[in-house]
Amino acid sequence: QTNDKEFLPNSKKKWNTFRYNYKLGQLEKVISSLAIDQNNNNLPDLIGLCEIENRSVINDILNTSIFHNQDFQIIHQDSPDIRGIDCALLIKNKFKILKKDFIVIDNPRDNRTTRDIVFVKLEFKNKIFNIFVNHWPSRYGGQENSNYKRVFVANVLKDYISLNTSDDEYTVIMGDFNDYPFNESITKFLMNDKFINLMNNDLVSGIGSYNYRGTWNWLDQIIISSNFSDKSIKLLSFGAFQKDFMLYKNKDGMIYPSRSFGGNTWYGGFSDHLPIYFKSEFIN
C-alpha cells in the first residue's frame, strides 16, 4: 500500500492531467539537453531518480520521445515513505544485473517512514559496479534536530557497503542526501579513504545543485570509490547541469532553479534541484 494522496487532483497541489503531462515534458527537455551537452546526444547509461511516485510514472517517462528506441531496465519498488515518493534507477540494457536490493531504513527513533535506498550490482566489460540511489530524510525541524536521521541512514548504508561490495569493484553512491559534503553524516559516518566525494572537489562544475535562501551548495552528491582513478577508467567530467531555461531570477536578482511548485503554488518549472552527473570512459 502506498500513499499517493499528494499527487491527486483534490490534493493541496491540485495535480491534474495537464500538470502531469507538462512535468513529463519538462523532464524530457532537461534530460535531452544534458544528453546533447555532455554525451554527444546519447542518453546517460544510468539515470538515478528521486521523488518518483510509482512505477507508472517511470513508464510514462520512458514513453517520452527521447526514450524511443532506447532499451532501459527499471530498478524500483514502492517504498514506505510517508509522502509516497520513491527512488529508482534506469539502466541501459548493455549492463548485466547481478543483484538488486532495496535497503529499508527503519529508524526506531523516527516515527516518519522514509525512502528505501536502491541498490544494484552490475557487470559490464568484465568489471563489477555497485550503484546506490539515495534520498535521505529531510531537514524538517532544522538541520541539527534532524541530523540523527541522516546519521542513521549513513551508518546503515556504510554497513551494507562493507558486507556487499569488495575493493576490486567500482562503487557509485548518488542522490539527494539533504546534507552538504561537509556535514558529519557524510564526512564522519559515510566517507572513508576508499571514497571520493565529487562534489567536494575543486574540479566540480557548477556552484551547487540547490539554492537555500540565496546560498548555493550541494545537497545532491555523487560519491565514487577511489579506484575510479585507476588505469582502466578515466573520469571525464562531473557537476551540476544547468541551462538558463532551468533557472529563474527573483525580484532581488538571485538565481534559483526553476521549480514546479513553491509550496502549493504551481510555477510550471522543472525542479527545485539541479540534476547532477558524472561521466567516465574505459581505457583500452
Predicted regions and their residues:
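Active-site His/acidic residue clusters
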Residues: 127, 133-146
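A long, amphipathic alpha-helix that forms part
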Residues: 144-168
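Extracytoplasmic/secreted cell-surface and envelope-processing proteins
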Residues: 56-59, 83-84, 140-143, 180-185, ...
